[in-house]
Amino acid sequence: MGDHFIRHIALLGFEKRFVPSQHYVYMFLVKWQDLSEKVVYRRFTEIYEFHKILKEMFPIEAGDINPENRIIPHLPAPRWYDGQRVAESRQGTLTEYCSTLMSLPVKISRCPHLLNFFKVRPDDLKLPTDSQVKKPETYLMPKDGKNNAADITGPIILQTYRAIADYEKGSSSQMALATGDVVDVVEKNESGWWFCQMKTKRGWVPASYLEPLDSPDEAEDPEPNYAGEPYITIKAYTAVLEDEISLEEGEAIEVIHKLLDGWWVIRKEDVTGYFPSMYLQKAGQDVAQAKSQIKSRGAPPRRSSIRNAHSIHQRSRKRLSQDTYRRNSVRFMQQRRHQRPEPQRSRSALREQQQPKTERPKPQPAVPPRPSADLILHRCSESTKRKLASAV
């Protein structure tokens, strides 16, 4: 077994294929111990056969001897007819199944049977060709991992992009590009690395090397959020260009614009600038997985650093300048200061005005002089007079 093991298995979705006959295959993204990531395709019948053999190999953990000892997850048997809704509804089950497999003891999660099943096969590398009568239809899992069979509206058409320059891959999990190559984007990761496929190749590609076919602008780029989101830097970065910002590891910042190329606009006090999103993690979250991605791929290059870039569009993509970000950010923060602290200042001012009054000693009433004995005898009751007389 050695050091060869799987770190994580994620279900990307499923495909509806028509060759040799209509059937469905599930797409899994498998991350290995060397941080390489491979996409494999498996039918549900294959997964179920794998599951049955795994139970036979570990009868105690499968609960065959004592059901209370079962730790291997359950998996429903295939149906006689598997339609699209059935394929869709199984995604939640398979996601939980894979997650549980990875959490099992090492003797199961790293056994040869499991590792061999999720290795890349020759069929995984045979992508559909243009000569096929009907190409597969791809259905991707929602970002939040939730899926409902009632939400099926049709296949997800993978977006097509064009390479604006040559790109040499830096690792086995990446894909090389030549200027003019047209790729289908399977996943747009916030890090700025997109998982793409092209003919018989698949791999991660920096988004900065790709452009949409119909427009130079990225339609899915969100609007700036000057309220900001709290993040923590998990790796130091020294600015290379004037519009970037240098930060040390562990600094608290606010993200005000998340761009799909992986270079986000952040704010540190009143300073704004570009910073690689791969070096950021939401405040309060575990940074271990984020740091593993840095080791695997690193920050993607910025488009402004690409040499010999050639776009098919007449105009360049629209981008806000750092002066605009800074001006809008300062304006927003000034408005926030005026809006929020006002009631607090007014209340504190009122307390300050009232405080001296409460601290001043109140004037004490004058103590009247003690009445003389003659006055007491003259004004008191008969009972008091008798008591005084007896006392004397």
From Swiss-Prot:
Topological type in the membrane: Peripheral membrane protein
Region feature (Disordered): 290-392
Domain SH3: 156-215, 226-285
Post-translational modification (record): Phosphorylated by PRKCD; phosphorylation induces activation of NCF1, leading to assembly and activation of the NADPH oxidase complex.
Subcellular location per the Swiss-Prot or TrEMBL entry: Cytoplasm, Cytosol; Membrane
Pfam families recorded: NCF1_PBR_AIR, p47_phox_C, PX, SH3_1
Entry's Gene Ontology BP terms: protein targeting to membrane; respiratory burst; superoxide anion generation
InterPro entries assigned: NADPH_Oxidase/PX-Domain (IPR051228), NCF1_C (IPR015039), NCF1_PBR/AIR (IPR032136), NCF1_SH3_1 (IPR035756), NCF1_SH3_2 (IPR035757), P47PHOX (IPR001655), PX_dom (IPR001683), PX_dom_sf (IPR036871)
Annotated GO CC locations: cytoplasm; cytoplasmic side of plasma membrane; cytosol; membrane; NADPH oxidase complex
PX domain: residues covered: 4-125
Residues found modified as Phosphoserine: 304-305, 321, 329, 348
Keywords from the named record: Cytoplasm, Lipid-binding, Membrane, Phosphoprotein, Repeat, SH3 domain
Primary location group: cytoplasm
Source domain of life: Eukaryota
A GO molecular-function descriptor: phosphatidylinositol binding
Keyword Repeat recorded: yes
Keyword Cytoplasm listed: yes
Basic residues composition bias: residue spans: 310-319
Function: Subunit of the phagocyte NADPH oxidase complex that mediates the transfer of electrons from cytosolic NADPH to O2 to produce the superoxide anion (O2(-)). In the activated complex, electrons are first transferred from NADPH to flavin adenine dinucleotide (FAD) and subsequently transferred via two heme molecules to molecular oxygen, producing superoxide through an outer-sphere reaction.
Entry note about domains: The PX domain mediates interaction with phosphatidylinositol 3,4-bisphosphate and other anionic phospholipids. In the autoinhibited, unphosphorylated state an intramolecular interaction with the C-terminal SH3 domain precludes phospholipid binding and interaction with CYBA. Phosphorylation disrupts the autoinhibited state.
Subunit structure: Component of the phagocyte NADPH oxidase complex composed of an obligatory core heterodimer formed by the membrane proteins CYBA and CYBB and the cytosolic regulatory subunits NCF1/p47-phox, NCF2/p67-phox, NCF4/p40-phox and the small GTPase RAC1 or RAC2. Part of a cytosolic complex composed at least by NCF1, NCF2 and NCF4. Interacts (via C-terminus) with NCF2 (via the C-terminal SH3 domain). Interacts with NCF4. Interacts with CYBB. Interacts (via the second SH3 domain) with CYBA; interaction is phosphorylation-dependent. Interacts with NOXA1. Interacts with ADAM15. Interacts with TRAF4.
PANTHER family in the cross-refs: NEUTROPHIL CYTOSOL FACTOR 1-RELATED, SH3 MULTIPLE DOMAIN
Protein name as catalogued: Neutrophil cytosol factor 1
Organism the protein comes from: Bos taurus
Origin organism lineage: Eukaryota, Metazoa, Chordata, Craniata, Vertebrata
